[in-house]
Protein backbone atom coordinates (compact mmCIF):
# COMPACT_ATOMS: atom_id res chain seq x y z
CA UNK A 1 0.00 0.00 0.00
CA UNK A 2 2.78 2.41 0.88
CA UNK A 3 4.59 1.73 -2.40
CA UNK A 4 1.50 2.76 -4.35
CA UNK A 5 1.43 6.27 -2.80
CA UNK A 6 2.88 9.02 -4.96
CA UNK A 7 6.22 10.49 -3.92
CA UNK A 8 5.38 14.03 -5.12
CA UNK A 9 4.77 16.62 -2.37
CA UNK A 10 1.23 17.70 -1.68
CA UNK A 11 0.48 20.99 -3.44
CA UNK A 12 -0.19 24.03 -1.24
CA UNK A 13 -3.61 25.56 -1.67
CA UNK A 14 -3.46 29.14 -2.89
CA UNK A 15 -4.19 32.01 -0.47
CA UNK A 16 -6.63 33.57 -2.93
CA UNK A 17 -9.23 31.47 -4.67
CA UNK A 18 -9.11 33.97 -7.55
CA UNK A 19 -5.99 35.80 -8.67
CA UNK A 20 -5.76 39.36 -7.28
CA UNK A 21 -5.06 40.78 -10.74
CA UNK A 22 -6.14 39.41 -14.04
CA UNK A 23 -5.80 41.03 -17.44
CA UNK A 24 -8.88 39.22 -18.70
CA UNK A 25 -11.21 41.04 -16.31
CA UNK A 26 -11.70 44.81 -16.19
CA UNK A 27 -10.67 46.75 -13.11
CA UNK A 28 -13.44 47.83 -10.76
CA UNK A 29 -13.07 51.00 -8.67
CA UNK A 30 -15.19 51.78 -5.66
CA UNK A 31 -17.29 54.90 -5.91
CA UNK A 32 -17.21 56.20 -2.36
CA UNK A 33 -19.67 59.01 -2.95
CA UNK A 34 -22.43 56.63 -4.06
CA UNK A 35 -21.90 54.57 -0.91
CA UNK A 36 -22.05 57.62 1.31
CA UNK A 37 -25.33 58.88 -0.11
CA UNK A 38 -27.19 56.21 1.86
CA UNK A 39 -26.29 57.96 5.12
CA UNK A 40 -28.43 60.49 6.91
CA UNK A 41 -29.50 63.69 5.22
CA UNK A 42 -27.41 65.97 7.42
CA UNK A 43 -24.25 64.14 6.35
CA UNK A 44 -25.16 64.53 2.68
CA UNK A 45 -25.51 68.27 3.19
CA UNK A 46 -22.03 68.42 4.68
CA UNK A 47 -20.69 66.44 1.75
CA UNK A 48 -22.03 69.03 -0.65
CA UNK A 49 -20.13 71.72 1.23
CA UNK A 50 -16.91 69.82 0.71
CA UNK A 51 -15.09 71.57 -2.12
CA UNK A 52 -12.06 69.36 -2.60
CA UNK A 53 -13.04 65.87 -3.82
CA UNK A 54 -9.43 64.67 -3.64
CA UNK A 55 -9.28 64.73 0.14
CA UNK A 56 -10.50 62.03 2.52
CA UNK A 57 -13.77 60.68 1.04
CA UNK A 58 -14.96 59.67 4.51
CA UNK A 59 -14.57 63.21 5.89
CA UNK A 60 -18.05 64.67 6.28
CA UNK A 61 -16.79 68.15 7.13
CA UNK A 62 -16.98 70.00 10.42
CA UNK A 63 -19.25 68.49 13.07
CA UNK A 64 -22.19 70.88 13.57
CA UNK A 65 -22.83 69.48 17.07
CA UNK A 66 -19.27 70.10 18.25
CA UNK A 67 -19.09 72.57 21.14
CA UNK A 68 -16.05 74.76 21.54
CA UNK A 69 -14.99 76.52 24.67
CA UNK A 70 -14.64 80.27 25.04
CA UNK A 71 -10.88 80.25 24.44
CA UNK A 72 -9.86 81.12 20.85
CA UNK A 73 -13.22 79.90 19.55
CA UNK A 74 -14.96 83.00 18.20
CA UNK A 75 -13.99 86.29 16.66
CA UNK A 76 -10.97 87.33 14.66
CA UNK A 77 -7.39 86.81 15.67
CA UNK A 78 -5.58 89.47 17.69
CA UNK A 79 -2.50 91.29 16.52
CA UNK A 80 0.74 90.16 18.11
CA UNK A 81 1.77 92.24 21.12
CA UNK A 82 4.55 94.73 20.50
CA UNK A 83 7.27 95.05 23.15
CA UNK A 84 7.88 98.59 24.41
CA UNK A 85 10.50 100.60 22.58
CA UNK A 86 13.86 101.11 24.21
CA UNK A 87 14.92 104.76 23.77
CA UNK A 88 18.56 103.86 24.42
CA UNK A 89 18.59 101.27 21.63
CA UNK A 90 18.79 102.58 18.03
CA UNK A 91 17.11 99.38 16.83
CA UNK A 92 14.03 99.82 19.03
CA UNK A 93 13.42 96.41 20.54
CA UNK A 94 14.53 92.84 20.02
CA UNK A 95 12.06 91.19 17.66
CA UNK A 96 11.42 87.61 18.70
CA UNK A 97 9.93 85.11 16.25
CA UNK A 98 6.14 84.95 16.25
CA UNK A 99 6.20 81.31 17.34
CA UNK A 100 8.38 81.98 20.40
CA UNK A 101 5.63 81.10 22.88
CA UNK A 102 4.67 77.92 21.11
CA UNK A 103 2.27 76.68 23.78
CA UNK A 104 0.04 79.72 23.12
CA UNK A 105 0.50 80.08 19.39
CA UNK A 106 -0.48 76.54 18.46
CA UNK A 107 -3.88 76.64 20.18
CA UNK A 108 -5.54 79.50 18.23
CA UNK A 109 -3.87 78.32 15.05
CA UNK A 110 -5.57 74.97 15.47
CA UNK A 111 -8.97 75.96 16.84
CA UNK A 112 -9.67 79.24 15.10
CA UNK A 113 -7.46 78.82 12.04
CA UNK A 114 -5.37 81.92 12.64
CA UNK A 115 -2.99 83.04 9.91
CA UNK A 116 0.14 84.81 11.13
CA UNK A 117 2.15 84.50 7.92
CA UNK A 118 0.73 84.26 4.42
CA UNK A 119 2.57 83.82 1.12
CA UNK A 120 0.91 84.71 -2.20
CA UNK A 121 2.30 83.20 -5.41
CA UNK A 122 1.10 85.50 -8.22
CA UNK A 123 1.22 84.52 -11.87
CA UNK A 124 1.58 87.23 -14.52
CA UNK A 125 3.03 90.71 -14.82
CA UNK A 126 2.22 94.19 -13.55
CA UNK A 127 -1.46 94.09 -14.53
CA UNK A 128 -2.21 90.79 -12.79
CA UNK A 129 -0.34 91.79 -9.63
CA UNK A 130 -2.10 95.15 -9.54
CA UNK A 131 -5.52 93.49 -9.63
CA UNK A 132 -4.45 91.33 -6.67
CA UNK A 133 -4.21 94.38 -4.38
CA UNK A 134 -7.86 94.16 -3.18
CA UNK A 135 -7.25 90.51 -2.25
CA UNK A 136 -4.24 91.49 -0.15
CA UNK A 137 -6.33 94.09 1.65
CA UNK A 138 -8.99 91.43 2.23
CA UNK A 139 -6.39 89.15 3.84
CA UNK A 140 -5.24 91.98 6.13
CA UNK A 141 -8.84 92.73 7.16
CA UNK A 142 -9.77 89.09 7.73
CA UNK A 143 -6.62 88.17 9.67
CA UNK A 144 -5.47 91.18 11.76
CA UNK A 145 -1.72 91.32 12.23
CA UNK A 146 -0.96 88.90 9.38
CA UNK A 147 2.32 89.30 7.51
CA UNK A 148 1.84 89.00 3.75
CA UNK A 149 4.72 88.00 1.46
CA UNK A 150 4.68 87.84 -2.33
CA UNK A 151 6.32 85.48 -4.80
CA UNK A 152 6.06 86.70 -8.39
CA UNK A 153 7.93 87.56 -11.58
CA UNK A 154 10.58 90.26 -11.96
CA UNK A 155 8.15 92.63 -13.64
CA UNK A 156 5.40 91.85 -11.15
CA UNK A 157 7.61 92.58 -8.14
CA UNK A 158 7.84 96.23 -9.19
CA UNK A 159 4.13 96.61 -8.45
CA UNK A 160 4.55 96.21 -4.70
CA UNK A 161 6.25 99.55 -4.20
CA UNK A 162 2.62 100.74 -4.37
CA UNK A 163 1.42 98.45 -1.56
CA UNK A 164 2.25 98.98 2.11
CA UNK A 165 0.54 95.77 3.19
CA UNK A 166 3.31 93.55 1.79
CA UNK A 167 6.30 92.67 3.93
CA UNK A 168 8.59 90.94 1.41
CA UNK A 169 8.39 90.43 -2.34
CA UNK A 170 10.64 87.76 -3.85
CA UNK A 171 11.32 87.11 -7.52
CA UNK A 172 10.38 83.66 -8.77
CA UNK A 173 8.58 82.96 -12.03
CA UNK A 174 5.80 80.45 -11.31
CA UNK A 175 4.97 80.28 -15.03
CA UNK A 176 8.37 78.80 -15.90
CA UNK A 177 7.73 75.15 -16.73
CA UNK A 178 11.44 74.23 -16.59
CA UNK A 179 13.02 76.14 -13.70
CA UNK A 180 16.64 75.74 -12.77
CA UNK A 181 16.98 72.92 -10.20
CA UNK A 182 19.16 75.04 -7.92
CA UNK A 183 16.70 77.94 -8.02
CA UNK A 184 13.74 75.60 -7.51
CA UNK A 185 15.16 73.85 -4.44
CA UNK A 186 16.49 77.10 -2.98
CA UNK A 187 13.05 78.71 -3.19
CA UNK A 188 11.42 75.69 -1.54
CA UNK A 189 13.90 75.90 1.31
CA UNK A 190 13.33 79.64 1.64
CA UNK A 191 9.55 79.28 1.85
CA UNK A 192 9.75 76.29 4.18
CA UNK A 193 12.01 78.20 6.57
CA UNK A 194 9.48 81.01 6.92
CA UNK A 195 6.83 78.68 8.41
CA UNK A 196 3.82 80.02 6.54
CA UNK A 197 0.35 79.24 7.82
CA UNK A 198 -1.24 79.80 4.40
CA UNK A 199 0.02 79.78 0.82
CA UNK A 200 -2.19 81.21 -1.93
CA UNK A 201 -1.44 80.73 -5.62
CA UNK A 202 -3.08 82.26 -8.68
CA UNK A 203 -1.18 80.02 -11.07
CA UNK A 204 -3.27 77.20 -12.50
CA UNK A 205 -1.86 74.22 -10.66
CA UNK A 206 -1.13 70.80 -12.01
CA UNK A 207 0.63 68.05 -10.12
CA UNK A 208 4.00 69.84 -10.41
CA UNK A 209 2.95 73.21 -9.01
CA UNK A 210 0.83 71.50 -6.34
CA UNK A 211 3.92 69.57 -5.24
CA UNK A 212 5.83 72.86 -5.04
CA UNK A 213 3.18 74.31 -2.73
CA UNK A 214 3.02 71.09 -0.72
CA UNK A 215 6.76 71.18 -0.01
CA UNK A 216 6.42 74.60 1.62
CA UNK A 217 4.78 72.67 4.53
CA UNK A 218 2.16 75.40 4.96
CA UNK A 219 -0.98 74.40 6.83
CA UNK A 220 -3.39 75.78 4.20
CA UNK A 221 -2.40 75.38 0.56
CA UNK A 222 -4.89 77.17 -1.69
CA UNK A 223 -4.61 77.44 -5.45
CA UNK A 224 -6.44 77.64 -8.74
CA UNK A 225 -6.30 74.45 -10.81
CA UNK A 226 -6.66 73.69 -14.49
CA UNK A 227 -10.20 73.14 -15.80
CA UNK A 228 -9.01 70.10 -17.77
CA UNK A 229 -7.08 66.87 -17.31
CA UNK A 230 -3.90 68.78 -16.40
CA UNK A 231 -5.26 69.20 -12.87
CA UNK A 232 -5.21 65.45 -12.19
CA UNK A 233 -3.59 64.74 -8.85
CA UNK A 234 -3.18 68.39 -7.85
CA UNK A 235 -6.00 68.24 -5.30
CA UNK A 236 -4.20 65.55 -3.32
CA UNK A 237 -1.58 68.08 -2.25
CA UNK A 238 -3.82 71.12 -1.83
CA UNK A 239 -6.23 71.88 0.99
CA UNK A 240 -8.50 74.11 -1.14
CA UNK A 241 -8.85 74.35 -4.92
CA UNK A 242 -10.64 76.66 -7.34
CA UNK A 243 -11.33 75.37 -10.83
CA UNK A 244 -10.64 78.14 -13.33
CA UNK A 245 -13.21 78.92 -16.01
CA UNK A 246 -10.55 78.71 -18.73
CA UNK A 247 -6.84 78.11 -19.08
CA UNK A 248 -6.07 81.85 -19.03
CA UNK A 249 -7.28 83.39 -15.79
CA UNK A 250 -6.44 86.91 -16.99
CA UNK A 251 -9.22 86.79 -19.57
CA UNK A 252 -11.74 87.21 -16.73
CA UNK A 253 -10.54 90.80 -16.31
CA UNK A 254 -10.98 92.79 -13.12
CA UNK A 255 -12.82 89.93 -11.36
CA UNK A 256 -10.25 87.27 -12.17
CA UNK A 257 -9.74 86.40 -8.47
CA UNK A 258 -13.42 86.26 -7.48
CA UNK A 259 -13.41 82.59 -6.39
CA UNK A 260 -10.41 83.08 -4.11
CA UNK A 261 -11.82 86.31 -2.68
CA UNK A 262 -15.15 84.64 -1.88
CA UNK A 263 -13.33 81.88 -0.02
CA UNK A 264 -11.06 84.27 1.91
CA UNK A 265 -13.92 86.53 2.97
CA UNK A 266 -16.31 83.72 3.92
CA UNK A 267 -18.15 84.03 7.26
CA UNK A 268 -16.77 81.90 10.06
CA UNK A 269 -18.71 81.30 13.28
CA UNK A 270 -19.20 84.76 14.82
CA UNK A 271 -17.11 86.53 12.14
CA UNK A 272 -19.32 87.97 9.36
CA UNK A 273 -18.34 88.01 5.70
CA UNK A 274 -15.40 90.33 5.12
CA UNK A 275 -16.19 92.90 2.41
CA UNK A 276 -13.92 93.38 -0.58
CA UNK A 277 -12.64 96.94 -0.94
CA UNK A 278 -11.87 98.62 -4.29
CA UNK A 279 -8.37 98.92 -5.72
CA UNK A 280 -6.20 101.49 -3.98
CA UNK A 281 -2.48 102.29 -4.25
CA UNK A 282 -0.07 104.30 -2.11
CA UNK A 283 2.78 106.34 -3.60
CA UNK A 284 5.94 107.20 -1.69
CA UNK A 285 7.27 110.73 -1.49
CA UNK A 286 10.59 109.83 -3.14
CA UNK A 287 8.88 108.37 -6.19
CA UNK A 288 6.73 111.49 -6.51
CA UNK A 289 9.81 113.71 -6.45
CA UNK A 290 11.60 111.68 -9.13
CA UNK A 291 8.58 111.66 -11.43
CA UNK A 292 7.92 115.37 -10.89
CA UNK A 293 11.45 116.14 -12.10
CA UNK A 294 10.86 113.99 -15.19
CA UNK A 295 7.66 115.61 -16.41
CA UNK A 296 8.90 119.12 -15.59
CA UNK A 297 11.95 118.52 -17.74
CA UNK A 298 9.53 117.46 -20.49
CA UNK A 299 7.75 120.83 -20.25
CA UNK A 300 4.65 119.79 -18.29
CA UNK A 301 3.12 121.49 -15.26
CA UNK A 302 1.46 119.74 -12.34
CA UNK A 303 -2.27 119.27 -12.92
CA UNK A 304 -2.21 120.65 -16.46
CA UNK A 305 -1.28 117.63 -18.57
CA UNK A 306 -2.97 114.47 -19.86
CA UNK A 307 -1.14 111.13 -19.67
CA UNK A 308 -1.08 109.16 -22.94
CA UNK A 309 -0.32 105.48 -22.32
CA UNK A 310 -0.53 102.42 -24.56
CA UNK A 311 1.58 103.20 -27.63
CA UNK A 312 2.48 100.28 -29.84
CA UNK A 313 5.76 98.71 -28.70
CA UNK A 314 7.41 95.35 -28.18
CA UNK A 315 8.66 96.31 -24.72
CA UNK A 316 7.57 94.34 -21.67
CA UNK A 317 7.17 97.64 -19.82
CA UNK A 318 3.94 98.34 -21.71
CA UNK A 319 2.10 96.81 -18.72
CA UNK A 320 -0.49 94.91 -20.75
CA UNK A 321 -2.81 92.24 -19.44
CA UNK A 322 -2.23 88.62 -20.42
CA UNK A 323 -5.94 88.42 -21.12
CA UNK A 324 -6.02 91.13 -23.81
CA UNK A 325 -3.37 90.89 -26.52
CA UNK A 326 -4.93 93.64 -28.66
CA UNK A 327 -4.33 96.51 -26.24
CA UNK A 328 -1.75 98.78 -27.90
CA UNK A 329 -2.48 101.53 -30.42
CA UNK A 330 -0.25 102.78 -33.23
CA UNK A 331 1.30 106.25 -33.11
CA UNK A 332 -0.67 107.27 -36.20
CA UNK A 333 -3.90 106.90 -34.23
CA UNK A 334 -2.49 108.64 -31.18
CA UNK A 335 -1.36 111.62 -33.29
CA UNK A 336 -4.97 112.08 -34.44
CA UNK A 337 -6.41 111.63 -30.96
CA UNK A 338 -4.31 114.30 -29.23
CA UNK A 339 -5.46 116.92 -31.74
CA UNK A 340 -8.72 116.98 -29.80
CA UNK A 341 -7.02 117.82 -26.48
CA UNK A 342 -7.90 121.38 -25.40
CA UNK A 343 -6.51 123.22 -22.38
CA UNK A 344 -4.06 120.47 -21.43
CA UNK A 345 -0.66 119.31 -22.60
CA UNK A 346 -0.47 115.66 -23.72
CA UNK A 347 2.43 113.74 -22.19
CA UNK A 348 3.41 110.51 -23.93
CA UNK A 349 4.72 107.67 -21.78
CA UNK A 350 7.26 105.52 -23.62
CA UNK A 351 8.30 102.07 -22.32
CA UNK A 352 11.70 102.21 -24.07
CA UNK A 353 14.03 104.98 -25.21
CA UNK A 354 13.97 103.68 -28.77
CA UNK A 355 10.34 104.84 -29.01
CA UNK A 356 11.25 108.50 -28.40
CA UNK A 357 12.31 109.11 -31.99
CA UNK A 358 9.16 107.44 -33.32
CA UNK A 359 6.92 109.66 -31.19
CA UNK A 360 8.73 112.78 -32.36
CA UNK A 361 8.35 111.72 -36.01
CA UNK A 362 4.59 111.12 -35.79
CA UNK A 363 3.52 113.75 -33.26
CA UNK A 364 6.16 116.47 -33.43
CA UNK A 365 9.52 117.48 -32.01
CA UNK A 366 7.94 119.65 -29.32
CA UNK A 367 6.01 116.73 -27.83
CA UNK A 368 6.35 116.09 -24.10
CA UNK A 369 7.76 112.59 -23.66
CA UNK A 370 8.45 110.79 -20.38
CA UNK A 371 10.35 107.51 -20.16
CA UNK A 372 8.73 105.32 -17.47
CA UNK A 373 9.02 101.56 -16.99
CA UNK A 374 7.77 100.93 -13.44
CA UNK A 375 4.17 101.01 -12.18
CA UNK A 376 5.19 103.15 -9.21
CA UNK A 377 6.44 105.99 -11.39
CA UNK A 378 3.43 105.62 -13.69
CA UNK A 379 1.10 105.96 -10.71
CA UNK A 380 2.95 109.07 -9.53
CA UNK A 381 2.69 110.60 -13.01
CA UNK A 382 -1.05 109.88 -13.16
CA UNK A 383 -1.51 111.28 -9.65
CA UNK A 384 -0.07 114.67 -10.71
CA UNK A 385 -1.97 114.76 -14.02
CA UNK A 386 -5.41 116.03 -14.96
CA UNK A 387 -6.44 112.69 -16.45
CA UNK A 388 -5.48 109.69 -18.56
CA UNK A 389 -6.16 108.50 -22.09
CA UNK A 390 -4.98 104.91 -22.36
CA UNK A 391 -5.66 101.54 -23.87
CA UNK A 392 -6.19 98.45 -21.71
CA UNK A 393 -2.98 98.79 -19.70
CA UNK A 394 -2.20 99.26 -16.02
CA UNK A 395 -2.70 103.02 -16.51
CA UNK A 396 -6.49 102.55 -16.60
CA UNK A 397 -6.51 100.73 -13.26
CA UNK A 398 -4.10 103.22 -11.67
CA UNK A 399 -6.21 106.17 -12.82
CA UNK A 400 -9.29 104.69 -11.16
CA UNK A 401 -7.30 103.80 -8.05
CA UNK A 402 -6.33 107.48 -7.71
CA UNK A 403 -9.81 108.75 -8.78
CA UNK A 404 -8.50 110.51 -11.87
CA UNK A 405 -10.63 111.13 -15.00
CA UNK A 406 -9.79 108.60 -17.68
CA UNK A 407 -10.77 107.48 -21.17
CA UNK A 408 -10.23 103.78 -21.83
CA UNK A 409 -9.82 102.48 -25.38
CA UNK A 410 -10.78 98.83 -25.86
CA UNK A 411 -11.02 96.47 -28.80
CA UNK A 412 -14.59 95.44 -27.89
CA UNK A 413 -17.39 96.28 -25.46
CA UNK A 414 -16.99 92.87 -23.83
CA UNK A 415 -13.36 93.61 -22.95
CA UNK A 416 -14.33 96.99 -21.54
CA UNK A 417 -16.98 95.50 -19.27
CA UNK A 418 -14.63 92.76 -18.09
CA UNK A 419 -11.64 94.94 -17.23
CA UNK A 420 -13.45 98.11 -16.11
CA UNK A 421 -16.78 96.90 -14.66
CA UNK A 422 -17.06 99.98 -12.43
CA UNK A 423 -17.09 102.47 -15.36
CA UNK A 424 -20.88 102.80 -15.31
CA UNK A 425 -20.85 103.76 -11.63
CA UNK A 426 -18.18 106.46 -12.03
CA UNK A 427 -18.85 109.70 -13.86
CA UNK A 428 -15.19 110.40 -14.61
CA UNK A 429 -14.44 107.13 -16.43
CA UNK A 430 -15.43 106.69 -20.07
CA UNK A 431 -15.00 103.42 -21.99
CA UNK A 432 -14.80 103.57 -25.79
CA UNK A 433 -14.87 100.28 -27.71
CA UNK A 434 -14.13 99.47 -31.32
CA UNK A 435 -17.12 98.28 -33.34
CA UNK A 436 -15.08 95.83 -35.43
CA UNK A 437 -13.39 93.97 -32.57
CA UNK A 438 -9.98 95.44 -33.44
CA UNK A 439 -8.43 98.28 -31.49
CA UNK A 440 -6.89 99.77 -34.64
CA UNK A 441 -10.40 100.50 -35.99
CA UNK A 442 -11.49 102.62 -33.04
CA UNK A 443 -13.44 105.77 -33.92
CA UNK A 444 -11.25 108.85 -33.41
CA UNK A 445 -14.24 111.20 -33.38
CA UNK A 446 -15.83 109.37 -30.47
CA UNK A 447 -12.61 109.66 -28.49
CA UNK A 448 -12.43 113.42 -29.11
CA UNK A 449 -16.04 113.89 -28.01
CA UNK A 450 -15.34 112.00 -24.79
CA UNK A 451 -12.65 114.48 -23.72
CA UNK A 452 -15.34 116.53 -22.00
CA UNK A 453 -14.65 114.34 -18.98
CA UNK A 454 -11.49 116.42 -18.37
CA UNK A 455 -13.37 119.73 -18.11
CA UNK A 456 -13.91 119.20 -14.39
CA UNK A 457 -10.16 118.87 -13.87
CA UNK A 458 -9.60 122.12 -15.77
CA UNK A 459 -11.99 123.91 -13.43
CA UNK A 460 -10.12 122.65 -10.37
CA UNK A 461 -6.72 123.85 -11.58
Swiss-Prot record:
Keywords: Chloroplast, Membrane, Plastid, Thylakoid, Transit peptide, Transport. The gene is PNSB1. Part of the chloroplast NDH complex, composed of a mixture of chloroplast and nucleus encoded subunits. Component of the NDH subcomplex B, at least composed of PnsB1, PnsB2, PnsB3, PnsB4 and PnsB5. This is Photosynthetic NDH subunit of subcomplex B 1, chloroplastic. Residues 75-85 have a biased composition (Basic and acidic residues). SUPFAM superfamilies: UDP-Glycosyltransferase/glycogen phosphorylase (SSF53756). It comes from Arabidopsis thaliana (Mouse-ear cress). Residues 66-90 are annotated as: Disordered. The keyword Plastid applies. NDH shuttles electrons from NAD(P)H:plastoquinone, via FMN and iron-sulfur (Fe-S) centers, to quinones in the photosynthetic chain and possibly in a chloroplast respiratory chain. The immediate electron acceptor for the enzyme in this species is believed to be plastoquinone. Couples the redox reaction to proton translocation, and thus conserves the redox energy in a proton gradient. Its main location: plastid. One of its GO terms (biological process) is photosynthetic electron transport in photosystem I. It is found in: Plastid, Chloroplast thylakoid membrane. It is a peripheral membrane protein.
Amino acid sequence: MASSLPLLPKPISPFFKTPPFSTSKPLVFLNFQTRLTSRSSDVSVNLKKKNNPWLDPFDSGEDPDNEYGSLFADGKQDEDPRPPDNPDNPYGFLKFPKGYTVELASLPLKIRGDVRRCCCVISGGVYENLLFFPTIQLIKDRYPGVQVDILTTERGKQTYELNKNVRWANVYDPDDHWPEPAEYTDMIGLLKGRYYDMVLSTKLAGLGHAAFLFMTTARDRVSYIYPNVNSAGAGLMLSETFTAENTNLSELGYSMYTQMEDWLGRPFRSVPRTPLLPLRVSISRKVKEVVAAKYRNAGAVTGKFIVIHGIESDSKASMQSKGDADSLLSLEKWAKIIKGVRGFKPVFVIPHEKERENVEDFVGDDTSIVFITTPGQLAALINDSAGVIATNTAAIQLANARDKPCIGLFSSEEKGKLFVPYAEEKSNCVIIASKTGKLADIDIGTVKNAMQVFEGSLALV
